[in-house]
Amino acid sequence: MSLIKIKYFIFLTFFIMVSCQDNTEQGIIPKDIMIDILIDMHIYEEAISELPYEKDTLKAIFKMKESEIFESYSVTEEIYRRSYSHYFFNPKELDNIYQVVIDSLSVYQQTKGND
C-alpha cells in the first residue's frame, strides 16, 4: 500500500471521527484520541511481548510504557479507565472505535512488513 493511500486513510479516519464526536460528556476522552491511545497501546504491547523476559517483567515494562502513552496524550489513567468504561457501556461507539483501531493496526502491520 502506498504512503499516499495510508496518509489519505489516516486523514479520512480522523475527519470522520472528529465530525462524529460528541463533546457533551465531561471527562471522557474524545473518540479520535481514544483511538490513537488504543493503537499506541496495542503496538507497544506487541513489541514488548516479543522481548525475552519473564511475564512479570513484561507486565512492568508495559505498565511503564502505558504511563508514557497517557502522559503523551495528557490524560491520566483514571480518565482513561473512565473513558474506556463509558465506551464499553456504549457498544456501538466501542465497535466503531475498535473498527478504526483494527483497520489502522492492519495498515501499520502491512507497512511494517514492507520495510
Model-assigned labels for residue ranges:
Residues P30-I48:
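Post-signal peptide N-terminal segment of mature Sec-exported envelope proteins
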Residues P52-D115:
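Compact alpha-helical subdomains of small soluble proteins
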Residues I16-S19:
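C-terminal motif of bacterial Sec signal peptides marking the signal peptidase cleavage site
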Residues Q21-T24:
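Bacterial signal peptide processing site
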Residues I4-F11:
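Sec-dependent signal peptide recognition
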